[in-house]
């Protein structure tokens, strides 16, 4: 007698919740220090005659709370591609030529580190999720990474282009569904971002573009996600408890990006921090209602640091203690805003800080946590996390 459909479906699914099993990160070698960046930026874009605008940009950089960023674009590359340095010059071909090659290469570095920490052969990877806002190509960056890593040709690939800063949450939401609905699945998730698509010279009439030039940096992060980990050989870092996405009310046009002949342009409204802080309480209440959690200082925080104003207003609105957003602020300071990759860097920062401080769990000694992605839409991704005990912790 043929097995019942329900039995077949049950056998296809994992038993337990999805968990992050390993994390790896990577940046280009070229580090740019924020204190020196205004002079460098206005010199390389031949804009030093715009003295008042340069002073505004210096103030933006000073207020950014960023110490340094990493960028693939070096002075040599920019000198060879002067149209990238202009504000409105046709330059998409030159930008595309860079990112379609370099985005998968940077992704490979992060993925190799994640796979090494995981400790299993790459042949066990069943699914690949690749996310980037940097360039579009066919076959995509997911295909290129599959070839670079030597993954099985039958790996199930998912390519997410042009999502923006919320997408670090999106990939976790998708990975959770894949891991929990496919028994034995091991999902490699990679976010790789290179600002070669958005770098451009200054304009006195487009200060929102200048804000982006003060904030964005390059980086790639990779994680392995799976359910029912092998207790002998796999070490979970965080469980993915729930995941949801929402579009904030009255936020249309708050963050826009448009791919044009001049590259990818970003447009930001000043009230983005206000829109997020106004709505974040509802996102938290909806996410944590099943757990009965209402004290936002009793959970650990991984919030996308779009800029310091977003973190500041969230902190004030929710009455968070200063240390709650320390991991997010530290990643912003050391790397800048790396779009989709940022929250995965913060996830890595969280587990490292917790271990180094001798905390009992990967979430600063706390059990429950939240990961937030904010981006175009205005879209918010909310992931509820559960930490795991750190071996040997008191």
UniProtKB/Swiss-Prot annotation:
Pathway per its UniProt entry is:
Secondary metabolite biosynthesis; flavonoid biosynthesis
Q: Name one GO biological process term.
A: polyketide biosynthetic process
Q: Does the keyword Hydrolase apply?
A: no
Q: What CDD domains does the database record attribute to this sequence?
A: CHS_like
Q: Which GO MF terms does the UniProt record name?
A: naringenin-chalcone synthase activity
**Keywords, A to Z?**
Acyltransferase, Flavonoid biosynthesis, Transferase
EC number(s) given by UniProt: 2.3.1.74
Pfam families, per the entry? Chal_sti_synt_C (PF02797), Chal_sti_synt_N (PF00195)
Q: Which reaction does it catalyse?
A: (E)-4-coumaroyl-CoA + 3 malonyl-CoA + 3 H(+) = 2',4,4',6'-tetrahydroxychalcone + 3 CO2 + 4 CoA
List the active site.
Answer: 165
Parts forming coiled coils = none
Q: Its family? A: Belongs to the thiolase-like superfamily. Chalcone/stilbene synthases family.
Physiological role: The primary product of this enzyme is 4,2',4',6'-tetrahydroxychalcone (also termed naringenin-chalcone or chalcone) which can under specific conditions spontaneously isomerize into naringenin.
Any idea what this protein is called? Answer: Chalcone synthase 3
Species whose genome carries this gene:
Bromheadia finlaysoniana
């Amino acid at each position: 007698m043929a097995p019942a459909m329900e039995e077949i479906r049950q056998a296809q699914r994992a038993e337990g919740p999805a968990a992050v099993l390993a994390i790896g990160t990577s940046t280009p070698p070229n580090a740019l220090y924020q204190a020196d960046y205004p002079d460098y930026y206005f010199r390389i874009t031949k804009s030093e005659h715009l003295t008042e605008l340069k002073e505004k940009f210096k103030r933006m950089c000073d207020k950014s709370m960023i110490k340094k960023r990493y960028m693939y674009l070096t002075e040599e590359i920019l000198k060879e591609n002067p149209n990238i340095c202009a504000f409105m010059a046709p330059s998409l071909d030159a930008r595309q030529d860079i990112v379609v090659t370099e985005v998968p290469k940077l992704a490979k570095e992060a993925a190799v580190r994640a796979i090494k920490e995981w400790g299993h052969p790459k042949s066990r990877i069943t699914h690949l999720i690749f996310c980037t806002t940097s360039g579009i190509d066919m076959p995509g960056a997911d295909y290129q990474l599959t070839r670079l890593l030597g993954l099985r040709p039958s790996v199930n690939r998912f390519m997410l282009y042009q999502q923006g800063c919320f997408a670090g949450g999106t990939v976790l939401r998708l990975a959770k569904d894949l891991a929990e609905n496919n028994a034995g699945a091991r999902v490699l998730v990679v976010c790789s971002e290179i600002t070669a698509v958005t770098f451009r010279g200054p304009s006195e009439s487009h200060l929102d573009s200048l804000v982006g030039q003060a904030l964005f940096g390059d980086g790639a992060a990779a994680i392995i996600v799976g359910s029912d980990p092998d207790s002998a050989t796999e070490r979970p870092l965080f469980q993915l408890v729930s995941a949801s996405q929402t579009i904030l009310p009255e936020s249309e046009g708050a963050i826009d990006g448009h791919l044009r002949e001049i590259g990818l342009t970003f447009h930001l409204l000043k009230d983005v921090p206000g829109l997020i802080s106004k709505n974040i309480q509802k996102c938290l209440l909806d996410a944590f209602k099943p757990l009965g959690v209402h004290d936002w200082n009793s959970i650990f925080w991984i919030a996308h640091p779009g800029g310091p104003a977003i973190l500041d207003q969230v902190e004030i609105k929710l009455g968070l203690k200063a240390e709650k957003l320390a991991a997010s602020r530290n990643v912003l300071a050391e790397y800048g805003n790396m779009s989709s990759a940022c929250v995965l860097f913060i996830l890595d920062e969280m587990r490292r800080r917790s271990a180094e401080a001798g905390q009992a769990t990967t979430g600063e000694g706390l059990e429950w946590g939240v990961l937030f992605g904010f981006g175009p839409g205005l879209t918010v991704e909310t992931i509820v996390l559960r930490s795991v005990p750190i071996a040997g912790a008191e």
